Curated annotation (Swiss-Prot):
Protein name in the entry: tRNA(Ile)-lysidine synthase
Record remark on domains: The N-terminal region contains the highly conserved SGGXDS motif, predicted to be a P-loop motif involved in ATP binding.
Location, primary (coarse class): cytoplasm
PANTHER family, per the entry: TRNA(ILE)-LYSIDINE SYNTHASE-RELATED
Enzyme Commission number, as recorded: 6.3.4.19
Gene label: tilS
Reaction catalyzed: cytidine(34) in tRNA(Ile2) + L-lysine + ATP = lysidine(34) in tRNA(Ile2) + AMP + diphosphate + H(+)
Taxonomic lineage of the native organism: Bacteria, Pseudomonadati, Bdellovibrionota, Bdellovibrionia, Bdellovibrionales
A GO cellular-component term linked to this record: cytoplasm
InterPro entries for this protein: Rossmann-like_a/b/a_fold, TilS/TtcA_N, tRNA_Ile_lys_synt, tRNA_Ile_lys_synt_N
Length: 316
């Protein structure tokens, strides 16, 4: 039986990335939600990677208003793993989060712990081209600055994202041809009204007016991201040793131009896993840091800042 183009394209793409990054003998833990992206990723990996080197984890967010869906999604993921002969690991949040950003943080922390406990070397996620495009457009609209265009790498910091060049439409087609279904979260559309409008209205309207334009836009933003990353001043954060534990050096911050100061602050927030900030937040932080006081404490962008004569630090 001849393989369809969708199957060939996705499986070959994932296999090429595994080979390119020499991952043939690496143990990979798949972050499995039951949605189209993660189901397609898991299925493809079972075809191009050794099954005994694969595992899948479902992260239950806890007893919130969506708990019935979460229970059913976990059961769906467990049955899928049994069908594909993959080890399944259910995890549960130890606390309820207040926002999607907090859930994301809890999820990655739990996945990282499980990875270490079970001897996995990588966590694979189903982030795809449309996810990345929507995120960059949202950050552009909110004025996050150049850091909002940060390149998302296929392989970095123990995370493997092989679907970044694949669209959601291609993933849906792949699942249809594999005769596999997904289990979508009914609350997804309500989580971020702006993202939902971009996905369901603006991007679809753009594609109708100019076929192929969304893919071209995604490529253009990726090119910008790569150019920003490769500029000499791109990594201001790297010039602050031990920034994760000690924060930023205030003396270094004061030598920078206003533009560079905002870039450094954005890089610092991103390094701490903070994403929900805007250009106005960065400008407000700058104003607070302009004061001549040696010791300052304030709260901006959902973070508690502590400043002394030597350091600028966000309290965890």
């Amino acid at each position: 039986m001849k393989l369809s183009k969708a199957k060939q394209d996705l499986d070959h793409h994932v296999w090429k990335l595994i080979k390119l990054h020499s991952l043939q003998d690496k143990k990979i833990l798949v972050a499995l939600s039951g949605g189209t992206d993660s189901v397609a990723l898991l299925r493809s990996l079972t075809k191009v990677h050794k099954k005994n080197l694969l595992g899948a984890c479902y992260f239950h967010h806890g007893e919130d208003s969506n708990q019935e869906y979460r229970k059913e999604a976990q059961e769906f993921c467990e049955k899928l793993c049994k069908k594909l002969e993959i080890e399944f690991y259910p995890l549960r949040a130890s606390q309820l989060a207040k926002s999607e950003a907090e859930y994301r943080e809890l999820r990655y922390e739990a996945l990282d712990r499980l990875k270490k406990e079970q001897g996995f070397e990588l966590v694979a996620t189903g982030h795809h081209r449309d996810d990345l495009l929507e995120t960059r457009l949202i950050r552009l609209i909110r004025g996050t600055g150049a850091q909002g265009f940060a390149a998302m790498h296929v392989l970095r910091d123990g995370l493997f994202r092989p679907l970044l060049e694949i669209s959601k439409k291609e993933l849906k087609k792949y699942l249809r041809e594999e005769r596999l279904r997904s289990f979508e979260d009914p609350t997804n559309k309500a989580l971020d009204p702006l993202r939902n409008w971009l996905r369901e209205e603006w991007l679809k309207s753009l594609e109708r007016r100019a076929r192929g334009s969304t893919a071209a836009l995604a490529r253009s933003l990726e090119t910008i991201a790569q150019e920003i990353e490769n500029r000499p001043w791109g990594d201001l954060l790297g010039q602050n040793e031990a920034y994760k534990t000690q924060g930023l050096r205030r003396s270094f911050y004061l030598t920078l131009s206003p533009f560079e100061q905002k870039r450094l602050l954005a890089q610092y927030l991103f390094s701490l896993g903070k994403r929900d900030f805007s250009q106005s937040h960065l400008e407000e932080i700058q104003k607070r840091l302009d004061k001549s006081q040696k010791v300052i404490t304030f709260k901006v962008a959902g973070c508690q800042w502590e400043v002394n004569a030597e350091q600028i630090k966000v309290q965890s």
